[in-house]
């Protein structure tokens, strides 16, 4: 039979394996990198037989995302094999691949600990060095039950009995046999770069009534270099952890016993947040947005009308007042539409751009709450643009310009994707085509590279997703620009056209930074707590050497404060080295040391938090330097408002 392999039509003998077929089509170097293949789209082992009628065979390489997933899944099996060798009484349960790695759950005589990792990794390495093959077999379900009962693997027996299939597939790696759909790597030698990472407890099948299992997490990559880079990123992430830095810098706290998933902002953290909020308000006013604010509670009937009650109520909070049910808002769009409807709108009035730093509440399960990055109460830089269809493209390009300017300001690279119509959607073909074309043309006019996510739009309209990339390569969902045909229809939003008739506008939902809490958390990690001078809660600290400099330091502090610098004075009777170190740990941009020599010269010794010493400078020079470096961006100019 003739089969397509990477663009070539090749004859494949009946009964040949995928490996045989690929060996004849690929160079030796490429073939050695193949882990599995796709037969007409279905993922199978490289040893699988090519069925008659197959039209396409696609190799799955070790350095592809699918290949990496296979390596990780297979490494979980290798780890389970090693654990069973070292701890024969341990019972195995499940071991999938996950983002950035894999895990396996065991019912062991004692919980595993990181102290066990070295021995387990040594045993895993033996399996890898032996290039132990992965061998697939199939057997009737009853025989599989008997097999695992004979091995004392009661959890596997429970899983098999719950399966609807009459036949199940098994994989053998050495003496270890596991229930698994597969596919797997050809042999353990492909899992040459792995690391066990951590242990945790996990209830069997996630039910706290079931036994507590011991879960071992690990990671694996196609080569040692990539693994080393990944481990370095993990260490960097620990060093930059916003939860640790938030406590160290006294920015915020959580009190889970009284308000889980809700932030208590301390003065310094609230100052950072306020600076960002003030900046956002001024930028939006410059770009001709109207600043509005809606209520926290809206009658349940409104959420039913919008569709949120049917589709989103599990994430909402409800309360009752005077026998009426109210929903605490999880988003701001309904209030903005009611503001739009409060007056008759002409085509000349459009677009209307409503901006709100809106506090919203969304119920997140306690297990997914994570510092500032996943909370239950947060503030969105939310806006809704209600415009004529012919204005849509220009409005979107202006939003993209704002995204670009803010990402550049905070030092982030970013990726853009346009998500198109899903299978289940509402609205006419014409409306979808208009909106999708407007999004694509706007991105192209901006000169920004983008990808298309086919079918990933919302059911009510296409969208642009922006993911920012931080300094250690992580991606974070940030801006969303979304076209909506549904809510203007449901809430009967209209404008009077040039023809005197009523017309339906288009609504654009957009958030640039998204959740301010999450964005500040990402910022803390991006800067490792060392905010740029304009954003630092304390921009300069004056340090005395002895009490003799106190009077001069107070006059210097007053001069800097008058110039708008956020400055503190440390006149404690402590050693200078201690005070300098403390200021550095607090990430204060400018450390200004004053001793007798500086008082005599009428200046200060300027040090940066990095340890660099700028030397003695007059007070006027210091004021000028800090005024320039600490000036807020919206006072400097230079922000652009469109694409040429």
Curated annotation (Swiss-Prot):
What InterPro entries does the annotation carry? aa-tRNA-synt_IIb, aa-tRNA-synth_II, aa-tRNA-synth_II/BPL/LPL, Anticodon-bd, Anticodon-bd_dom_sf, TGS, Thr-tRNA-ligase_IIa, Thr/Ala-tRNA-synth_IIc_edit
Transmembrane among the record's keywords? no
Per the entry, the cofactor note is:
Binds 1 zinc ion per subunit.
The keyword tRNA-binding is annotated on this UniProt entry: yes
Would you identify the family this protein belongs to, as annotated? Belongs to the class-II aminoacyl-tRNA synthetase family.
**Pfam families according to UniProt:** HGTP_anticodon (PF03129), tRNA-synt_2b (PF00587), tRNA_SAD (PF07973)
Q: Where does Zn(2+) bind?
A: 333, 384, 509
Record GO biological process: threonyl-tRNA aminoacylation
Segments forming a coiled coil: none
Q: What does this protein do?
A: Catalyzes the attachment of threonine to tRNA(Thr) in a two-step reaction: L-threonine is first activated by ATP to form Thr-AMP and then transferred to the acceptor end of tRNA(Thr). Also edits incorrectly charged L-seryl-tRNA(Thr).
Name used for this protein in its record: Threonine--tRNA ligase
A GO CC annotation recorded here is: cytosol
Domain of life the protein comes from: Bacteria
The protein's location, in the record's own words, is: Cytoplasm
Q: Which gene encodes it?
A: thrS
**Source organism:** Nitratidesulfovibrio vulgaris (strain ATCC 29579 / DSM 644 / CCUG 34227 / NCIMB 8303 / VKM B-1760 / Hildenborough) (Desulfovibrio vulgaris)
Ranges for the TGS domain? 1-61
**UniProt keyword annotations, A-Z:** Aminoacyl-tRNA synthetase, ATP-binding, Cytoplasm, Ligase, Metal-binding, Nucleotide-binding, Protein biosynthesis, RNA-binding, tRNA-binding, Zinc
Required co-factor(s) are: Zn(2+)
Give the Gene Ontology MF terms in alphabetical order. ATP binding; metal ion binding; threonine-tRNA ligase activity; tRNA binding
């Amino acid at each position: 039979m003739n089969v397509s392999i990477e663009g070539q039509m090749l004859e494949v003998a009946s009964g040949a394996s995928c490996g045989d077929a690929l060996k004849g089509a690929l160079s030796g170097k490429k073939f050695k990198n193949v882990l599995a293949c796709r037969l007409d789209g279905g993922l199978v082992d490289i040893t699988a037989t090519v069925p008659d009628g197959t039209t396409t065979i696609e190799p799955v390489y070790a350095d592809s995302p699918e290949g990496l997933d296979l390596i990780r899944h297979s490494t979980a099996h290798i780890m389970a094999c090693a654990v069973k060798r070292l701890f024969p009484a341990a019972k195995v349960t499940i071991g999938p691949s996950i983002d950035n790695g894999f895990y396996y759950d065991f019912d062991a005589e004692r919980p595993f600990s990181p102290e066990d990792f070295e021995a387990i990794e040594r045993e895993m390495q033996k399996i890898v060095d032996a290039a132990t093959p992965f061998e697939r077999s199939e057997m009737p379900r009853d025989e599989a039950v008997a097999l695992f009962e004979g091995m004392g693997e009661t959890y596997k027996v429970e899983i098999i009995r719950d399966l609807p299939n009459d036949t199940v597939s098994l994989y053998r790696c050495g003496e270890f046999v596991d229930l698994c759909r597969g596919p797997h790597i050809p042999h353990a030698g492909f899992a040459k770069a792995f690391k066990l990472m951590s242990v945790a407890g996990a209830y069997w099948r996630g039910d706290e009534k079931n036994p507590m299992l011991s879960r071992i997490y690990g990671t694996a990559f196609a080569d040692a270099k990539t693994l080393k880079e990944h481990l370095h990123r993990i260490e960097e992430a620990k060093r930059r952890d916003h939860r640790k830095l938030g406590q160290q810098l006294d920015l915020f706290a959580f009190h889970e016993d009284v308000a889980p998933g809700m932030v208590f902002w301390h003065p310094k953290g609230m100052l950072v947040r306020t600076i960002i909020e003030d900046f956002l308000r001024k930028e939006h006013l410059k770009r001709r947005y109207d600043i509005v604010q809606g209520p926290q509670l809206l009658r349940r009937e409104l959420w039913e009308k919008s569709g949120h009650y049917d589709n989103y109520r599990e994430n909402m909070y409800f309360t009752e007042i005077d026998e009426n049910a109210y929903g605490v808002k999880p988003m701001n769009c309904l209030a903005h539409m009611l503001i739009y409807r409060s007056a008759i709108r002409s085509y000349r009035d459009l677009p209307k751009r409503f901006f709100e730093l809106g506090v919203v509440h969304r119920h997140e399960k306690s297990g997914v709450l994570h510092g500032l990055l996943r909370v239950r109460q947060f503030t969105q830089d939310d806006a809704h643009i209600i415009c004529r269809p012919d204005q849509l493209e220009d409005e979107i390009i202006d939003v993209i310009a704002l995204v670009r300017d803010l990402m550049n300001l905070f030092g982030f690279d970013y990726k853009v994707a346009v998500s198109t119509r899903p299978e289940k959607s509402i609205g006419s073909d014409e409306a979808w085509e208009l909106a999708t074309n407007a999004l694509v043309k706007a991105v192209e006019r901006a000169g920004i590279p983008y990808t298309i996510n086919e079918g990933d739009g919302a059911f009510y309209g296409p969208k642009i997703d922006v993911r920012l990339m931080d300094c250690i390569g992580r991606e974070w969902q940030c801006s969303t620009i979304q076209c909506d045909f549904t809510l203007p229809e449901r809430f009967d939003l209209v404008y009077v056209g040039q023809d005197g008739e009523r017309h339906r506008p288009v609504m654009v939902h957009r958030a640039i930074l998204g959740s301010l809490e999450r964005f500040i958390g990402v910022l803390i990690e991006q800067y490792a707590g060392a905010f740029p001078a304009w954003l630092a809660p304390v921009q300069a600290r004056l340090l005395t050497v002895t009490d003799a400099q106190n009077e001069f330091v107070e006059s210097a502090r007053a001069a800097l404060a008058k110039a708008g610098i956020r400055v503190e004075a440390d006149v404690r009777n402590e050693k200078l080295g201690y005070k300098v170190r403390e200021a550095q740990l607090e990430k204060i941009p400018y450390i200004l040391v004053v001793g007798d020599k500086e008082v005599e010269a009428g200046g200060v010794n300027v040090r940066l938090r990095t340890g660099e010493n700028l030397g003695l400078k007059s007070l006027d020079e210091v004021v000028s330097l800090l005024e320039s470096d600490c000036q807020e961006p919206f006072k400097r100019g230079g922000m652009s408002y469109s694409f040429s």
